[in-house]
Amino acid sequence: MYFVDRQKIEQILGFLEKQLGLFEGHDNWDGDLSELIAERLIQTSIDSVLDVGNAVIDGFIMRDPGSYEDIIDILQDEKVISEEKAIQFKKVLPLRKMLVQDFIEVNHEELHAVFSENIEAFKQFPDLVRNYLTNELGPVSAFKN
């Protein structure tokens, strides 16, 4: 029996959807405060995908990831996401290092360009995960799966 905390996964997916809505709802990212907001929205979007990916991997007792890229590879191998989506996520992953470790030298043009070019993978991720969970565990019930 698998232990997949659907409630926690759904909470993170809802948060991701909110973050993406905020990002797409704002069209002018010029200015210090706007740049900081964009940085946070992008970082938490990336972290949401990684956290949900880890929860799915742990819950279904898939192989242990050794890196962030490995999380994406496992999700692709297990057919949670397509190869196309995996490629898009891997293009965005280096932004996390820029935001978390190289935060003094963030290239905002690159940040916006790379994330915007690959945002569709993030927008589709919640439904891909929900569909995977439903196919593997069945529909949500009153009991925790």
Features from the language model and the residues they span:
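Solvent-exposed interaction patches of small proteins and small membrane subunits
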Residues: 1-145
